[in-house]
């Protein structure tokens, strides 16, 4: 079942493109890009979510990430 978002596809795609452009500008390899992205998520959770909700949000985020991973063999 598709997820309904309060954000338009255009908003999401524009922000994603800008974030990817920053990583490309700095020629960040995949491992550094993942590290920085993970740190950004951690920072957002720790600074924007109430302490009592942080673990649930982190678990929900992790499940969403895992469910969005493409399992084909190509990379």
Curated annotation (Swiss-Prot):
TM segment ranges: none
Gene3D superfamilies registered for this protein in UniProt: YejL-like (1.10.3390.10)
InterPro entries in the cross-refs: UPF0352 (IPR009857), YejL_sf (IPR023202)
Top-rank lineage group of the source organism: Bacteria
Disulfide linkage: none
Family to which the UniProt record says this protein belongs: Belongs to the UPF0352 family.
Protein name: UPF0352 protein YejL
Source organism (scientific name): Shigella dysenteriae serotype 1 (strain Sd197)
Taxonomic placement: Bacteria, Pseudomonadati, Pseudomonadota, Gammaproteobacteria, Enterobacterales
